[in-house]
Regions:
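Extreme N-terminal starter segment of soluble prokaryotic enzymes
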Residues: 1-3
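Glycine-rich adenosine-cofactor-binding loop
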Residues: 5-12
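Glycine-rich beta-strand-to-loop/alpha-helix junction loops that act as flexible
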Residues: 8, 32-33, 69-71
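Structural detector of well-ordered beta-strand residues that form the stable sheet scaffold
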Residues: 29, 67, 88-90
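N-terminal beta-loop-helix "entrance" segment that forms/cooperates
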Residues: 30-49
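N-terminal glycine-rich "phosphate-gripper" loop used for MgATP/nucleotide binding
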Residues: 44-83
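Conserved small/polar residues in nucleotide/adenosyl-binding loops
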Residues: 92-94
Length: 94
């Protein structure tokens, strides 16, 4: 399973750490990544605010699941755009 984790804060680090332990994970992509997250996956250098780049990259890389940390990214319409593209989304609020 290919997962894209959006965000680079402490919440996303905790999520990324756990996702990276999954036996079904093939690749963990990070948007944008951070010094703490980067060892867990593949940093893409995409801003968490760049909805177009997140959606386009998800389609290009055949991402199975997008996990979003920042609420601002969701408020900007990422959930709707991913749904239109047929990509699963996990909304995590801790």
């Amino acid at each position: 399973m290919k997962v894209l984790l959006v965000g680079g804060g402490g919440r996303e680090h905790a999520l990324g750490w756990k996702i990276a332990q999954s036996p079904v994970l093939s690749t963990l992509y990070l948007a944008p990544g951070s010094p703490g997250l980067n060892p867990l996956g593949v940093p893409l250098g995409i801003s968490a605010d760049d909805i177009d780049a997140i959606v386009n990259t998800s389609v290009e890389k055949s991402i199975d699941l997008v996990v979003v940390g920042p609420e601002a990214t969701l408020a900007a319409g990422l959930a709707d755009r991913l749904a239109t593209a047929g990509i699963a989304l996990s909304l995590i609020h801790i």
